[in-house]
């Protein structure tokens, strides 16, 4: 088991966005959360990535617990435990969230360098290998503004992989891409699940993309059943 969510609830005033939701994803799966905008998909993604609190529920990744049943405030006893949970998750945002003033390789090493996981030289080598894996070995020292949407998405994926997460989350990965670029990203995601055993969770309203690469499709209407 990579990620398990039990009894998750989230409301905004009188709007119950997520109600008693259970979810599980295992290594090698590509799970698609499919649904229209406003059905709670992004809220769910933000909660499991510890970017937003739920009202109630339990979230566990490989034995590392984010929350207890009375709410999703972190229950870590130390900063190292908090990092251990967060490092199990890699997040690729809809708008990529690359730092425009940093080169591609600098974007990749920023977070692990701040955590002191390895020295700078080792991280640069790791980053170069990942960029080669996503087909961007020639873009190491350029700035994000020079890249296409598909290339930015690949950089964002490589950056998320720098911490070697067991679960990789994507928020609308094809929203800014043409179909050819979307298919290329889909192939890369499939390889991450099949070859590396990553558990992949994708939030999207792109039905074609979801059905192409998903090993399981869940509707976001289940959030507020």
Task: For each feature predicted by the language model, list its residue ranges.
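Conserved ABC ATPase signature
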Residues: 143-147, 151
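Catalytic Walker B motif of ABC-type/P-loop ATPase nucleotide-binding domains
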Residues: 168-171
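Short coil-to-helix segment of the ABC ATPase nucleotide-binding domain corresponding to the Q-loop/switch region
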Residues: 102-110
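A short, proline-enriched helix->beta-strand linker immediately N-terminal to the Walker B motif
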Residues: 162-166
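Conserved ABC transporter NBD signature motif
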Residues: 57-71
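Helix N-cap at the start of a conserved alpha-helix in ABC-type nucleotide-binding domains
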Residues: 179-181
């Amino acid at each position: 088991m990579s990620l398990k969510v039990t009894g998750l609830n989230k409301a905004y005033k009188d709007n119950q966005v997520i109600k008693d939701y259970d979810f599980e994803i295992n290594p090698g799966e590509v799970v698609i959360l499919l649904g229209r905008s406003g059905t709670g998909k992004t809220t769910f993604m933000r909660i499991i990535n510890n970017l937003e609190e739920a009202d109630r529920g339990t979230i566990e990744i490989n034995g590392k617990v984010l929350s207890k049943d009375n709410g999703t405030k972190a229950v870590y006893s130390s900063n190292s435990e908090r990092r251990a949970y967060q490092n199990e998750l890699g997040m690729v945002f809809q708008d990529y969230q690359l730092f425009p003033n940093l080169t591609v390789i600098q974007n990749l090493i920023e977070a692990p360098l701040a955590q002191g996981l390895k020295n700078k030289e080792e991280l640069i080598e790791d980053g170069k290998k990942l960029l080669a894996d996503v087909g961007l070995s020639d873009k190491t020292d350029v700035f994000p503004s020079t890249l296409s949407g598909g290339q930015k998405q690949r950089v964002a994926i490589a950056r998320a992989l720098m911490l070697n997460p067991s679960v990789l989350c994507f928020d609308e990965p094809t929203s800014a891409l043409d179909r050819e670029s979307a298919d290329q990203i889909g192939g890369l995601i499939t390889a991450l699940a099949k070859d590396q055993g990553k558990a992949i969770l994708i939030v999207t309203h792109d039905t074609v993309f979801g059905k192409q690469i998903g090993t399981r499709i869940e509707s976001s209407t289940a959030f507020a059943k």
